Design a protein with these regions (language model features):
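ABC family nucleotide-binding domain
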Residues: 2-4, 9-213, 217
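Conserved beta-strand-loop-alpha-helix hinge in the C-terminal portion
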Residues: 221-245
Length: 254
């Protein structure tokens, strides 16, 4: 079942200086199936960040539409957007975005607190999740007391605590060392196998090689895509590297 549909998305900005029109997206179209793990790649300025902001209901396209389970994001009333994001989307950021004055436990539970859930409901949702992610032993610590990898695991737990329809990850390995990055990517594979739909924007070939499909954006359009098929991570890594070389040299992918 298609959980996300992106149809002919366009986005035009007015430049801050000079007033020129800048077209960041020029007609992006793709869909994501429930349970898929999709990575989006592209050079700086290709439109990845603009697209992610639209998918996160943080911005609206100037043309086209985005539908999550058949619901148009641009049709949601402004007053309802925060609740929609909280109930349907999970977010994992490069810089973790944990609150230093909150314990790890309180950071994870924050979306449920904002949703008005009972203490019993919150504990029931959190306990199996933190055990699965291997952070049940750091819940009473504060973010500044744990490692970068543990912070990112806590951020993933916070993103998944509401059982989101779609998990959006923005450069999730960008602030991690190689060991913590590998750990996080294995964790993403695990939660994806359990049925979580993931859409990840990344510059990292290694991170993208863990996905089931990779979309490449160039000059505001989807330029090419690769399906994993039966490829290993190493084989997919090479395919991605070859495609990025084509992007940089301006040649078309075969």
């Amino acid at each position: 079942m298609e959980i996300l549909q992106v149809k002919e998305n366009k986005k035009t900005y007015t430049a801050r200086f000079g007033g020129n029109q800048v077209q960041a997206l020029k007609g992006v179209s793709f869909s994501v199936q429930e349970g898929e793990y999709v990575a989006i790649m592209g050079e700086s300025g290709s439109g990845k960040t603009t697209l992610l902001n639209i998918l996160a209901a943080l911005d609206k396209p100037t043309g086209g539409q985005v539908m999550l389970e058949g619901k148009r994001l641009d049709a949601i009333e402004e007053r309802d957007l925060a609740a929609f994001r909280r109930d349907n989307l999970g977010f994992v950021f490069q810089e973790f975005n944990l609150l230093d004055t909150f314990s790890i436990e309180d950071n994870i539970l924050l979306p449920l607190v904002l949703a008005g859930r009972s203490v019993a409901e919150m504990k029931s949702a959190m306990e199996p999740l933190v055990r699965s992610l291997g952070i049940d032993n750091i819940l009473k610590k504060f973010p500044y007391e744990v490692s970068g990898g543990q912070k990112q695991r806590a951020a993933v737990a916070r993103a998944m605590i509401t059982n989101p329809k779609l998990l959006l990850a923005d450069e999730p390995t960008g602030a991690l060392d190689s060991a913590s990055s590998a750990d996080l990517l294995q964790m993403f594979e695990k939660v994806n196998r359990q049925g979580q739909t993931i859409l990840m924007v990344t510059h990292s070939v290694d991170a993208a090689s863990h996905a089931g499909r990779v979309l490449f954006i160039r000059d505001g359009v989807v330029f090419h895509q690769i399906y994993r098929g039966e490829s290993t991570n190493q084989q997919l890594y090479k395919k991605i590297s070859d495609t990025l070389t084509m992007l940089r040299t301006g040649r078309d992918a075969e």
